[in-house]
């Protein structure tokens, strides 16, 4: 077996499959594009679903890739096991309706065992297979695999919902008896026992059925096009080929671990407690790649995942004695390790470091808050005479403040308290169940549509015309091909068409189809790409249509021009964003409609009003500069040399279109555009908002809509000026400010009067002191305007020794507000209010010294006040 670096393994994999006629698919962005079923790209096949479900037919049915992936189902296990990672690389080879089982197994065995390639010893390889899949068993035998090395496993059948499915065969490497101390042997495989002896290095999925959840597996229909989907983990291959005990001792992780040793002054012990080193090395890889791909830490979705990873890594850094910000210092090391295939980490190093460091600094402040929360919890335990920190509280420290359980346990034990491990596990499981229920594993591939996939007739989109005559090649009605149609809805393919099929954020054209008499025979309501790339027109049929007949195709020209204004403006906006807020502000999605444009981009904070003003000004300057717009068809490399910006998540063919707007903007784009920027007329941003962690959205309008937006603003300003009696529009702001200042002064004066009134009223309330169980208490209903006034009462009460406990109730509108304050350790305000609040159909809580609740049944206020003596 050859001893190869991870970069050599990756390259040898790709070279082998290229020698078998495969094209190399570049690694896709970790942030999925147009796939709501995925939080992250989580496998090599995730970006190829369009090929497997038949919605797109690839130019080459043989594909290979090395795909960066992220899975975060069990973050808490990372660092505890030898092979668990958040970010990993999946090596794959795929056949879309081309070769199948025989070639997949034979070539796979060749790659693994040939001296020209990986040169694995054959006697160290074991394979599992689906018991009913005798063909795979026989093919392995034909390759020279001993029957004793073939293990039937009932679970070796791959399916996720409706769509492609089939048996799979897995390949394992036997590391020997040293990794099998109990000498269990092949039962480890047969019974799926977690072990370090048999390492799964490759899974070959034989996708041959269309899974249908409504029928038994034995009744699944064969796919019209059988597929091969395989996945081999680079980290596992590297561990085996480099003789590493775990994945972390490979060249993918050790350089990071060495840097952590320098930062911490601690030494990594392969056989000792090294969890913190592993966590940091794993998490900084995921953070570096994900942030480089446009995801940013936040409080929801993938942003929350990144925040959790970073905080977990920081806490493990603290366990190693690293108390300052340090993670950002590891980004260059990650980039250097992966540079040969993923240069983007080093290219975006400054931005990634900036985001990581800023998030570390924010978390440092959060840690202080978490420590304060823990101190409060421990003080509460002491006051209640308890000795165990509840699981739900431990989970809150873990989930909200990023405290690992080990840290909470250590701090609690130092203070003399135990922790509720089982309660924590229960709370953790509830969260995991919620997370798993919310995500479809990998996403269903979807059923293959044989009718659409069978369209092979050529069709060409003509960019430079709004109308042309063309022959009707294909009619599909009720999902079947037909020679003619006279009513209902149908799908049509023409030899050539002026209708743009929806793509790249630009909506489809609409229009009409006419016969040779000039009569409209169909209305085009949508155009999408067929699996083989032809524009597929969805039409409402008004009169007879037949294959082989020529028709005149006319798009709605006015609508197209409006869409083009927005699309061309989108390119200008993209360039302006780069200039004003930074190169990191790359496109994360767009929509160019007739009435508006919508542009999503990566950015870590709201765009300020001043920045929006500069962006809007810059776009309009380019419109007024009347820049010539040119399009060039060339190859991708030449386009990049021209400075063309490739858009987020897009895949490009051999020939690409470069859209250039003067010397201001150069992008790869397959859409339609104006001839000159001046045709846009005017550009106006109408909204900027956040749509997720690290993603912002701008909605803008152009031309007539932009003029109307400005006019509406002017009308609104005129109304305001009239209301505040400003003599001119320019005076309106000063008038509004003066009114605001006056209102603030009045509100302040009003608040002061309320405080004086409350203080006066408090004198009467605080006179009515009662006693029960040796505790002096005041329980009274008060007439106040809001809950804030109750707190003012409590503040006044604290100033003197009126009583030990204060209970106030107020009916405010339709709600009942309750306040409990306590000066004695014998009465916990938070616990007391939990007993009182249900009386008025409410609930609440709080700290030992202060608690509040809200209720809805004012008729029970007297009952609540009477209950105080019993509860106190």
From Swiss-Prot:
The protein, known as: Alanine--tRNA ligase
Reactions it catalyzes: tRNA(Ala) + L-alanine + ATP = L-alanyl-tRNA(Ala) + AMP + diphosphate
Keywords associated with the record: Aminoacyl-tRNA synthetase, ATP-binding, Cytoplasm, Ligase, Metal-binding, Nucleotide-binding, Protein biosynthesis, RNA-binding, tRNA-binding, Zinc
Subcellular location: Cytoplasm
Matching PROSITE patterns: AA_TRNA_LIGASE_II_ALA
A GO CC term attached to the entry: cytosol
Function: Catalyzes the attachment of alanine to tRNA(Ala) in a two-step reaction: alanine is first activated by ATP to form Ala-AMP and then transferred to the acceptor end of tRNA(Ala). Also edits incorrectly charged Ser-tRNA(Ala) and Gly-tRNA(Ala) via its editing domain.
Organism in which the protein naturally occurs: Streptococcus pyogenes serotype M3 (strain ATCC BAA-595 / MGAS315)
Stated family: Belongs to the class-II aminoacyl-tRNA synthetase family.
Cofactor names: Zn(2+)
Domain topic, free-text comment: Consists of three domains; the N-terminal catalytic domain, the editing domain and the C-terminal C-Ala domain. The editing domain removes incorrectly charged amino acids, while the C-Ala domain, along with tRNA(Ala), serves as a bridge to cooperatively bring together the editing and aminoacylation centers thus stimulating deacylation of misacylated tRNAs.
Residues that bind Zn(2+): 567, 571, 669, 673
An example Gene Ontology biological process: alanyl-tRNA aminoacylation
Gene: alaS
